[in-house]
Swiss-Prot record:
Subcellular location per the Swiss-Prot or TrEMBL entry: Nucleus
Subunit structure: Component of the RNF20/40 complex (also known as BRE1 complex) probably composed of 2 copies of RNF20/BRE1A and 2 copies of RNF40/BRE1B. Interacts with UBE2E1/UBCH6. Interacts with RB1 and WAC.
Modified-residue entries (Phosphoserine), positions: 42, 528, 585
Protein name: E3 ubiquitin-protein ligase BRE1B
Native source species: Macaca fascicularis (Crab-eating macaque)
GO MF, any single term: protein homodimerization activity
Length: 1001
């Protein structure tokens, strides 16, 4: 039951409107706790047990409160420790910087003392006075007071550690700390004053030195420039000193203001901290009150549980004693009901009294306000009366009419004078405008003549320049056309060469693919006949020369070839690798470019190739022949060796022929280089392009011949393989593979060289294109210059025409001005006529003024009649007001009677409701003679109230926090899941967090 009571108390605290919460809190604060009832006890042991249980319960409550207090105190201690740490840190920072300041001041004082000792010594007559070793001027000799040591109590504890400083501050009292800090401040002030005095003495010393220099300059022959320089430096020094003093004063003032603001900030922070502490104290008090309230609620819940348990026991018990208990509980319920009724009645009476009290206070306030207003009637009220407004309207009307007449008269006179003055001014302006226009016309004619002469000169100069440019363009035209034709032909030829190179590359890839297939076939055949050996297998295992040995070459070795041969799918990878190798690297391109500059390197390269091939063929040694070999095979092997030697000799001959060709090309390149150096720029470009073209053609022809040879050899090898037996085919295939590898390396090197040469040719062609572009740009610039000259000539013609037109227009303007002068004379005549007409109109205005005065008299008479009418209306208004005053008391009486009737009606309704409740209770007593039956009926009513109104089967165990209507949890959850999220009673919308369970015990 205690758990249910706690849940109910928590639910009551969490739900309900704030008004109900406040009333409940007020009730709990005034609740009287009844003594604890221990119930039926049969022995002292049970008494001790229950007392111990109660004590344990109380101790647990106190322990919880103690733990909460300890947690809060621990938090406060942590906050205070943090604050103390920050305060200690700030104190240490202040102490450190103050100590540094004192040390620097002492160092300055020691420096000045040393300078004073040096300056106190007698000076030699021939020595020059100047600054010391550290760059500061010597002070005066009379600085003995600076050398006096400061008192010990004024010196700060500079060597004192930080922790000792904090401990000393904590150990000493506030008076001691204040005295110590005061002494430290006095020391700092004294030290700073000493520094200032020393600086003043130094300044005086400098001035004396300057005076001595001036006097010595007067006695000794010095240049005027040096004297002027010293004077300027002295003035500059004084100006800088004044500026420094001003800046120091400004800095001191700003620092004082900053310190004041800092003090204000610290005071505000202390106030904030104090307010935070007060807030924490108040929160502590609130927590204490809340705990007390929870405790009282718990006691009240336990008391209610015990009361309910006693009620149910009494209802379930039988006999005479049980009947007495039920009757007492019935009386208790009746008293509670009467008490509630009386409370409701008292609340209604109190509301009525408060309403009447508010009405009474409002009436008293209005009465007092009206009395005060009646005693001091302001002028505004008098001005707001009808009579005053009528008189004011009549007066303002007459006054406005008189002002209008007066203003009209003044306007007529002013208009007459203005017309006369404007007429005279207009005549003067016309004369001055005529003179100004004549002068302007003369000056413009002179300017136009000058501009015309200048334009003619410019036109002649432009014409001469245009003819010169035209002649120059006619001479340069054929050359430019020839250059364009040459460039276009070279571009077409370069495109053709690129196409041929692509085609040869494609053929080379096909040949490489066929070589890969042959390798695969030969590797398969070697695996099929493993017992047969080849005398040159050891020579095949030697690595082929790569790029590291002698320039560009194939990267793959025979070992790699043997490893890759068994897998047929690896042929594509080898072909792709070879395709990548066909692209010349940057090192090869650089080598080719260097070969163009120094052909000896290219000459040495072909000589190195046959040596490498011979080394590959000779190898580490021939393997031992097989044991089961026949003499015919040995003869074949000898023939094969002879054939290999013959092939090597042919290869050497080819390499020597290539060497000769390379030497011849070297000589041609030297000749071309000499011609290129001696020829002009345009011819050099032409020669370079032609040489590149010739070189590319030769390389293409050589590549074609190489490809044909490779194809023929491939065909021959395929025929030999088809005709011979298996062993001969295998050996021939191996030899062919070796030979093809070597040829492939050579072709690759040649191909890479050709590709690099093609790149060089392309680069030269691009340079030529850039040069041609520059030439075309120059041609365009010349054309643009010619066009500009033509446009300037056209513009000059147009300007000439425009100037003529302007001259004609100015002549027309002169004629127009003459016509304007004539027109102005006509307007003068018209204005004179207008003046005469205005004089006539002035007479008409005077006549109109007399008519207006007559109308004014007529309006005055009308105003008198209106005043009489206002008097009549005033009498009627007074009559209406008296009648209104007579009707107002009747209205007040009727209002009071109506309020009294409504009050009596409310009272009668309350009496009727009270009597009806009593009648219902009496009927119950009459119907049910026994008190148990009455209680059972009431229990049924209460159960009906506790059942859910939606399903009428389950108990109410869920509340909607939006409207505080109670239903069963299943109905509320079903409506929420069915998206009917509205209260069944009041249609108030609710959400997922707007309903929860309640426990009604």
């Amino acid at each position: 039951m205690s758990g249910l009571g706690n849940k109910r108390a928590a639910g009551d605290g969490g739900s309900g409107p704030p008004e109900k919460k406040l009333s409940r809190e007020e009730k709990t604060t005034t609740t009287l706790i009844e003594p604890i009832r221990l119930g039926g006890i049969s022995s002292t042991e049970e008494i001790d047990l229950k007392v111990l249980q109660f004590k344990n319960k109380k101790l647990a409550e106190r322990l919880e409160q103690r733990q909460a207090c300890e947690d809060e105190l621990r938090e406060r201690i942590e906050k205070l420790e943090k604050r103390q740490a920050t305060d200690d840190a700030t104190l240490l920072i202040v102490n450190r910087y103050w100590a540094q300041l004192d040390e620097t001041v002492e160092a300055l004082l020691r420096c000045h003392e040393g300078q004073g000792e040096l300056s106190s010594a007698p000076e030699a007559p021939g020595t020059q006075e100047g600054p010391t070793c550290d760059g500061t001027p010597l002070p005066e000799p009379g600085t003995s007071e600076l050398r006096e040591p400061l008192p010990l109590q004024l010196r700060p504890p500079l060597s004192e550690p930080a922790l000792a400083f904090v401990v000393a501050l904590g150990a000493s009292s506030s008076e001691e700390v204040e005295l110590e800090l005061q002494g430290r401040m006095e020391f700092s002030k004294a030290a700073v004053s000493h520094v200032v005095e020393a600086s003043d003495r130094l300044q005086r010393r400098v001035e004396e030195l300057c005076q001595r220099v001036y006097s010595r300059g007067d006695s000794e022959p010095l240049s005027e420039v040096a004297r002027a320089r010293t004077r300027e430096l002295g003035r500059e020094n004084r100006r800088l000193q004044d500026l420094a003093t001003q800046l120091q004063e400004k800095h001191h003032r700003i620092s004082l203001e900053y310190s004041e603001l800092q003090d204000k900030v610290t005071s505000a922070e202390t106030k904030v901290l104090e307010m935070e502490t007060t807030v924490e104290d108040l929160q502590w008090d609130i927590e204490k009150l809340r705990k007390r309230e929870q405790k009282l609620n718990k006691h009240l819940a336990e008391a209610l549980e015990q009361l309910n348990s006693g009620y149910y026991v009494s209802g379930s018990s039988s006999g005479f004693q049980g009947g007495q208990i039920t009757l007492s509980m019935q009386k208790f319920e009746m008293l509670n009901a009467e008490l509630e009724e009386n409370q409701e009645l008292a609340n209604s009476r109190m509301a009525e009294l408060e309403k009447l009290q508010a009405e009474l206070q409002g009436a008293v306030r209005t009465n007092e306000r009206l009395k005060v207003a009646l005693r001091s009637l302001p002028e505004e009220v008098v001005r707001e009366t009808g009579e005053y407004r009528m008189l004011q309207a009549q007066f303002s009307l007459l006054y406005n009419e008189s002002l209008q007449v007066k203003t009209q008269l003044d306007e007529a006179r002013g208009l007459l004078l203005a017309t006369k003055n404007s007429h005279l001014r207009h005549i003067e302006h016309m004369e001055s405008d005529e003179l100004g226009l004549q002068k302007k016309l003369r000056t413009e004619v002179i300017q136009l003549e000058d501009t015309l002469a200048q334009v003619r000169k410019e036109y002649e100069m432009l014409r001469i320049e245009f003819e010169q440019n035209l002649a120059a363009n006619e001479q340069a035209g054929p050359i430019n056309r020839e250059m364009r034709h040459l460039i276009s032909s070279l571009q077409n030829h370069n495109h053709q060469l690129k196409g041929d190179a692509q085609r040869y590359k494609r053929k080379l890839r096909e040949v490489q693919a066929e070589i890969g297939k042959l390798r695969a076939q030969t590797s398969g055949s070697t695996h099929s006949t493993p017992n047969l050996g080849h005398p040159e297998d050891s020579g095949l295992s030697a690595p082929a020369p790569g790029k590291e040995e002698g320039g560009p070459g194939p990267v793959s070795t025979p070992d790699n070839r043997k490893e890759m041969a068994p897998v047929p799918g690896t042929t594509t990878t080898t072909t792709s690798v070879k395709k990548e190798e066909l692209v010349p690297s940057e090192e090869d391109v650089q080598g080719l470019t260097l070969g163009a500059q120094g052909p000896s390197s290219r000459g040495r390269e072909p000589e190195a190739r046959p040596k490498r091939e011979l080394r590959e063929r000779e190898g580490p040694g021939l393997g031992p022949p097989p044991v089961a070999s026949a003499l015919s095979r040995a003869d074949r092997e000898k023939a094969k060796v002879e054939e290999a030697k013959r092939k090597e000799s042919e290869l050497l001959k080819g390499l020597r022929a290539e060497l000769k060709k390379a030497q011849e090309s070297q000589k041609e390149m030297k000749l071309l280089l000499d011609m290129y150096k001696s020829a002009p720029k345009e011819q050099r470009d032409k020669v370079q392009l032609m040489a590149a073209e010739r070189k590319a053609k030769a390389e293409v022809d050589e590549l074609r011949s190489r490809i044909r040879e490779l194809e023929e050899r491939d065909r021959r090898e395929s025929k030999k393989i088809a005709d011979g037996d298996a062993l001969r085919r295998i050996r021939q295939a191996e030899e062919q593979i070796e030979h093809l590898q070597r040829k492939l390396g050579a072709t690759k090197q040649e191909e890479e060289a050709l590709l690099s040469e093609m790149d060089v040719t392309g680069q030269a062609f691009e340079d030529m294109q850039e040069q041609n572009g520059r030439l075309l740009q120059q041609l365009r610039e010349k054309d643009d210059a010619n066009f500009k000259l033509m446009s300037e000539r056209i513009k000059a013609n147009q300007i000439h025409k425009l100037l003529r037109e302007e001259k004609d227009e100015l002549g027309e303007q002169v004629l127009g001005l003459k016509s304007q002068v004539d027109a102005q004379l006509l307007t003068v005549q018209k204005l004179e006529e207008k003046e005469r007409a205005l004089q006539g109109s002035l007479g008409g205005v005077e006549k109109e003024l007399t008519l207006r005065s007559q109308a004014l008299e007529l309006n005055k008479r009308k105003a008198v009649e209106a005043a009489q009418l206002a008097e009549d209306l005033k009498v009627q208004l007074e009559h209406v007001q008296t009648r209104l005053r007579e009707i107002q008391p009747c209205l007040a009486e009727s209002r009071a009677a109506r309020e009294k009737e409504s009050f009596n009606l409310k009272r009668a309704q309350e009496d009727i409701s009270r009597l009806r409740r009593k009648l219902e209770k009496q009927r119950k007593v009459e119907v049910y003679a026994d008190a148990d039956e009455i209680l059972q009926e009431e229990i049924k009513e209460y159960k009906a109230r506790l059942t859910c109104p939606c399903c009428n089967t389950r108990k109410k165990d869920a509340v909607l926090t939006k409207c505080f209507h109670v239903f069963c949890f299943e109905c509320v959850r079903g409506r929420y899941e069915a998206r009917q999220r509205k209260c069944p009673k009041c249609n108030a919308a609710f959400g997922a967090h707007d309903f929860h369970r309640i426990y009604i015990s």
